[in-house]
Design a protein with these regions (language model features):
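Conserved core architecture of multi-subunit DNA-directed RNA polymerases
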Residues: 1-230
Length: 230
């Protein structure tokens, strides 16, 4: 059998890895990378995978004799692909819950602006991302900032929660201190449940400048991507 000589085989130039960028997948990126939207809980009908079901063949085939329509390979060679489900309501990614609670203490619960002045603390931009995040969180979560605008020029004046607390596995509440002059009935209203929908709305309003100043990235790790929508 004829074989190619070493001289005729082109040598592929290897690339040098200079870094790895970790990121949070945005909902749009998940949809773009997905090969199928899963809309049915069914798996098989007449021994064939249901299109749009949990075993949709576009995600790869499992049985001999079937060919994956995504890459044209059989069950032994296809690497498999992921699909996506459009959630009826958003939910928290449990692994980001602590960070979500910290971000809620850094931005206004009404207008989503950062609670500290970026101009007064612009030296933070010289810090590495993680160091900057810890620095900004320490400043923005200070008990001395009771209203949006106490430490910035363009705040909305909204009274900020004293605490962001978690109950159970992933239920968040904003808690305000008792305010003089309120009746006992009104004081009970000083606790507000922060549903994933509410948190998502707050995080979507955070500007890219504020996201960057906190040490996150508008391109790789926006806070609203920490709430699962897809």
């Amino acid at each position: 059998m004829a074989t190619k000589s070493k001289e005729t085989i082109p040598k592929k130039k290897s690339s040098k890895i200079i870094g790895i960028q970790f990121s949070i997948l945005s909902p749009d990126e998940i949809r773009k990378s997905s090969v199928a939207e899963i809309t049915s809980r069914d798996t098989y009908i007449n021994n064939k995978p249901v299109i749009g079901g949990l075993f949709d063949s576009r995600m790869g085939v499992l049985e001999p004799g079937l060919i994956c329509p995504t890459d044209g390979l059989d069950y032994m060679e296809t690497p498999g692909y992921f699909g996506h489900i459009e959630l009826a309501r958003p939910v928290f990614y449990i692994q980001y819950l602590t960070t979500i609670m910290k971000i809620l203490r850094c931005v206004c619960i009404k207008c989503s602006k950062l609670k500290i002045s970026k101009e007064n603390y612009k030296q933070a931009l010289k810090m590495a991302s993680e160091e900057r995040w810890n620095y900004v969180f320490k400043l923005a979560s200070s008990s001395s900032i009771t209203r949006c605008g106490d430490d910035s020029e363009d705040g909305c004046g909204c009274l900020q929660p004293k605490k962001i607390k978690k109950e159970g596995l992933a239920t968040l509440f904003a808690e305000w201190d008792n305010i003089n002059g309120l009746s006992e009935e009104d004081k009970e209203k000083l606790n507000m449940k922060l549903t994933p929908e509410i948190v998502l709305k707050i995080f979507r309003r955070i500007s890219d400048d504020d996201v960057n100043f906190m040490g996150f990235s508008p391109v790789f790790s926006r806070p609203d991507w920490m709430v699962c929508q897809v």
